[in-house]
Design a protein with these regions (language model features):
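Acidic, Ala/Val/Gly-enriched low-complexity intrinsically disordered segments
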Residues: 2-5, 10
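Phosphate/nucleotide-binding catalytic core
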Residues: 9-517
Length: 517
């Protein structure tokens, strides 16, 4: 882990932000674990602790005062490549050069993660976010170049090859990563089966969870009060489908063209603890969309404890402890929550002074550009605000299964997909976004106090991406086809595609403007 003084950033509006480790892996997964394997006694005691933590959480929710600043935050996972754009297994060296606590390891040695501090969305907040991200990434690029490494923002690196699975250096240093790999394989009892059927088909067995490291994302955070959490989560579940359709950027894995957002299905399979017999019995996967609308954040934590065995049963000495403000620490409950991979995850953070609840949106792939990332964030925050405050909630008119079906259809086919929408029926998702959702997102952003010129700046990007039906996935698929039509073999074409993608990414031109010639 990188240590050092927090990084400060002064925005174009003059606001000073300090980067600190609040929204990332340690907050959701707990502190560094102490073991790579666990005994039956540890697992038994951990289960007891989970139930105790859950009871404390239930009591605390009904009496506590939580932060209610409606702040937003962001995590961005990044790929590291060599100068030929093959994966570079040297995140430790890159992080040593960057020497900034805003940047941390991820499970794959060819990944790092950047954590952005919480900020207010109102006024110039979104532009401050854009400026800050660009500044931090430019700094990281400069430092990475010192060890001959490039940084790439995409959902799955197109140049990943099967040889990665046999490279013992793929896993980042740290007991928590080794423990997660061991626990998934032990729970499953056999090798990991990856079976993806899209434009092409890919099926193989992996001896570790290395395929999970291929999946890099943008994770958006929204701080909400206890009474607002359920409407916000339900709204986020509904818009998951148009979100993933708009942002799809992971069409290629292990030299195969698969789903537009292959990362969704790949992540599910890569850390699936269920052998086929358990899947056939209907046992829930750890990467989970959910199965019902909720009425409280407690519903989700209760499901976590009821349905999912512990992956990392790490017992904490602070289990019964509280902060100086009286917020229970609940370390086992929070660690367990970090090993249930919901696409919209609840976060309880006891904080240093005031506890807070957050919604962590995990649907978006990384990239393609900083402008696209902030436009995706604007769309998400605007839609959640609009839907959660509606007089007649949309989730009262949509079966949960329909929301889940929409999500999978959009992950598979991106902006080419069709969805079912209440009050409309079947509609192409691109048309839904342009005609209906962009105006609704604008209303939500207005309610949040976002400057009007910024609403237009970011939602124009969303509108044009949907209108042209060109996102990161469709551009990659089309550009690969063009290169192969010109005579390049698949491997050479993927290397050239990734070079051109990197060039476009650094231009910061939104992806709908990327050319195919």
């Amino acid at each position: 882990m990188v240590t050092g003084a927090p990084t400060q950033f002064v925005s174009s509006s003059g606001t000073r932000y300090t980067y600190f480790r609040t929204h990332g892996y340690l907050q959701t997964m707990g502190a560094e674990v102490n073991s790579k394997t666990y005994s039956r006694e540890q697992r038994t005691r951990y289960r007891q602790r989970l139930l105790e933590n859950l009871d404390r959480f239930a009591g605390y929710l009904s009496t506590a005062t939580f932060a209610d600043t409606a702040s937003i935050g962001l995590e961005l996972e990044l790929n590291l490549t060599n100068q030929d754009f093959s994966p570079a297994l040297r995140n430790a060296a890159v992080l040593e050069e960057i020497a900034d606590p805003a940047f941390q390891t991820e499970i794959g040695a060819f990944n790092i993660e950047m954590n952005h501090p919480a900020l207010a969305i109102g006024g110039s907040g979104l532009r401050d976010l854009e400026d800050s991200l660009r500044l931090q990434l430019n700094r990281a690029d400069t430092h990475a170049a010192e060890v001959k490494t490039e940084i790439l923002m995409t959902g799955i690196l197109p140049t990943l090859r099967p040889s990665l699975l046999d490279n013992k250096e793929w896993l980042s240093a740290g007991k928590r990563y080794a423990a997660l790999n061991t626990s998934v394989l032990q729970a499953r009892g056999e090798d990991v089966h990856i079976d993806l059927r899209g434009k092409e088909s890919l099926s193989f067995y992996a001896k570790n969870i290395a395929p999970e490291a291929a999946c890099t994302s943008v994770q958006l955070h929204l701080e909400v009060s206890p009474e607002d959490f359920a409407p916000a989560w339900n709204a986020a579940q509904i818009i998951a489908a148009p979100q993933v359709a708009l942002a799809a950027n992971s069409p290629i894995f292990m030299e195969h063209v698969l789903w537009h957002e292959t990362r969704i299905e790949l992540f599910k399979q890569a850390i699936d603890t269920r052998p086929p017999e358990m899947r056939n019995q209907g046992v829930r996967p750890r990467v989970w969309f959910g199965e019902r609308w909720i009425t409280s954040i407690f519903d989700l934590f209760e499901e976590n404890v009821r349905y999912f065995p512990a992956l990392l049963p790490e017992l904490s000495r602070s289990s019964g402890g509280s902060t100086s403000a009286g917020a229970p620490l609940l370390p086992e409950l929070r660690l367990h929550n970090g090993t249930v991979y919901r696409w919209n995850r609840p976060i309880y953070d006891p904080g240093e002074h005031t506890p807070n609840l957050r919604l962590e949106n995990r649907i978006l792939p990384a990239g393609p550009t900083v402008l696209d990332i902030v436009a995706n964030a604007a769309f998400f925050y605007g839609m959640v605000q609009h839907l959660r405050t509606a007089d007649r909630p949309l989730w009262t008119r949509l079966a949960f299964k329909s929301a889940a079906d929409n999500f999978l259809a959009c992950a598979r086919d991106g902006l080419e997909s069709t969805v079912y929408w209440p009050g409309i029926g079947e509609i192409p998702v691109a048309e839904l976004i342009v005609r209906h959702l962009v105006p609704q997102a604008a209303l939500g952003l207005q309610e949040l106090g976002v400057d009007q010129q910024l609403i237009e700046r970011y939602l124009d990007v969303i509108r044009e991406r949907a209108r042209t039906e060109q996102n990161g996935a469709s551009w990659q698929i089309s550009y690969l086809r063009r290169l192969e039509d010109e005579g390049l073999d698949r491997r050479a074409a993927l290397a050239e595609l990734t070079r051109k993608y990197w060039q476009n990414m650094n231009s910061n031109a939104p992806v709908h403007e990327w050319r195919l010639d």
